[in-house]
């Protein structure tokens, strides 16, 4: 696997304390605020006219929750991310034509949100392990492009 046993321990230890539903909504919301061009995939979501509108948008929260629950499931199959995300890769790449760069952006936003929520606990070692994970997930989701 691409993570050492120690790194897996750090990731799982922190992840067990994450409120997946809440963090998912915040991460997706921040993605849409910070990288506004990603909003074009969410035109059916209603009001995305301001940061406040986006962060309180129920559809954004619901999809963010869905996204992070999938990420959570993926963590259980950390040594086979390609397999874990094959169906989602197909959906996002072949059907929705999402630029794989967006998966990387969301991963980086997720790292920011975790740092914000966990403060000192999200130390450099934990961040390094999570950066590997989000890069691995982004790469698995982009798999259909290669």
Swiss-Prot record:
CDD domains on file: Hb-beta-like
Entry binding sites for heme b: 63, 92
Residues in Globin domain copies: 2-146
Tissue specificity of this protein: Red blood cells.
Keywords, in A-Z order: Heme, Iron, Metal-binding, Methylation, Oxygen transport, Phosphoprotein, Transport
One Pfam family it belongs to: Globin
Residues with N6-succinyllysine modification: 17, 59
The protein's role, per its UniProt record: Involved in oxygen transport from the lung to the various peripheral tissues.
Similarity-based family: Belongs to the globin family.
Subunit composition and interactions: Heterotetramer of two alpha chains and two beta chains.
Name of this protein: Hemoglobin subunit beta-2
Lineage: Eukaryota, Metazoa, Chordata, Craniata, Vertebrata
